[in-house]
Amino acid sequence: MSNKINPKRREPTVAAAVAAATAVVATNTSSSTGSSAGNTSSANTSSSSSSSLSSAGGGDAGMSADLTSLFECPVCFDYVLPPILQCSSGHLVCVSCRSKLTCCPTCRGPLANIRNLAMEEVASNVKFPCKHSGYGCTASLVYTEKTEHEETCECRPYLCPCPGASCKWQGPLDLVMQHLMMSHKSITTLQGEDIVFLATDINLPGAVDWVMMQSCFGHHFMLVLEKQEKYDGHQQFFAIVQLIGSRKEAENFVYRLELNGNRRRLTWEAMPRSIHEGVASAIHNSDCLVFDTSIAQLFADNGNLGINVTISLV
């Protein structure tokens, strides 16, 4: 049996939101009229408006909290944000869930492309909590700022940065290193801003990853060397450094990778990636040190490749 949500719970919710939006508009109109009539009239209007808001939700904070709950999607419990569409009975569902549904999850009626302008007006006057509030974020934002904030929120959960491990772990930034040390014990950590990253057996067939940690300046950096087959028989190496930290922290550093030997030198210098961003997109766009197997053989010694890594403060 499917868990059908009682439609009666949503209908008064939308009605309450419309009433609240009307109250807000009425309050603004009354305040404007009272102001033009004089100070005494303005004071009376202000008192009346304050009383009205208080009864609606216990003041501005209470009202905002009450209204926010009206925007919960009945499927995923995230917020339904503008543009807001409703079914023919007035029930709401978020855009993400709507694309996966064939009928309204509340009344099982047909989904319709009907804009709910009243709810959109309410949404423009409500502040929504960050979706990472469970990880400690206390920000409250208008809906137009919500997505941008959440993409760079310092409290957002981080994915495991270890490439090729298919690790499903995610958690707060301050637990990333603990996870790596407990679950990926094979990763070696070297101290200092100048180290040699030694990748062994680079002639192994297929896609291979080499990973090492570097600790300096009070931070940890993950050094990654990936070998991929880009197209038939043509293999390439991609070397990159990412900071176990935020994007803002990464802006304080620059890393330098250098292959050196046999009177040849190949270098790359850039700002480290944050684990917010990961390394996949940088590798896909070749925004890192890139060289093919023939270049690798010029610097390799018995199948082993040493990469000099230098981390510097900007």
From Swiss-Prot:
Binding residues annotated for Zn(2+) 1, in chain numbering: 130, 137, 149, 153
Subunit architecture: Component of some E3 complex at least composed of sina, ebi and phyl. Interacts with eff.
Species in which this protein is naturally found: Drosophila virilis (Fruit fly)
Lineage: superkingdom: Eukaryota
Gene3D superfamilies: Apoptosis, Tumor Necrosis Factor Receptor Associated Protein 2, Chain A (2.60.210.10), Zinc/RING finger domain, C3HC4 (zinc finger) (3.30.40.10)
Stated name of the protein: E3 ubiquitin-protein ligase sina
Family note: Belongs to the SINA (Seven in absentia) family.
Span list, region Disordered: 27-55
Pfam families for this protein: Sina_RING, Sina_TRAF, Sina_ZnF
Known role: E3 ubiquitin-protein ligase that is required for specification of R7 photoreceptor cell fate in the eye by mediating the ubiquitination and subsequent proteasomal degradation of Tramtrack (ttk). E3 Ubiquitin ligases accept ubiquitin from an E2 ubiquitin-conjugating enzyme in the form of a thioester and then directly transfers the ubiquitin to targeted substrates.
Region annotated SBD, chain positions: 122-314
Pathway the protein takes part in: Protein modification; protein ubiquitination
The protein's enzyme class: transferase
Gene Ontology BP annotations: proteasome-mediated ubiquitin-dependent protein catabolic process; protein ubiquitination; regulation of R7 cell differentiation; sensory organ development; ubiquitin-dependent protein catabolic process; visual perception
Record field: catalytic activity: S-ubiquitinyl-[E2 ubiquitin-conjugating enzyme]-L-cysteine + [acceptor protein]-L-lysine = [E2 ubiquitin-conjugating enzyme]-L-cysteine + N(6)-ubiquitinyl-[acceptor protein]-L-lysine
Zinc finger (RING-type): 73-108
Comment block on domains: The RING-type zinc finger domain is essential for ubiquitin ligase activity. The SBD domain (substrate-binding domain) mediates the interaction with substrate proteins. It is related to the TRAF family.
Keywords from the named record: Cytoplasm, Developmental protein, Metal-binding, Nucleus, Sensory transduction, Transferase, Ubl conjugation pathway, Vision, Zinc, Zinc-finger
Chain segments annotated as coiled-coil in the UniProt record: none
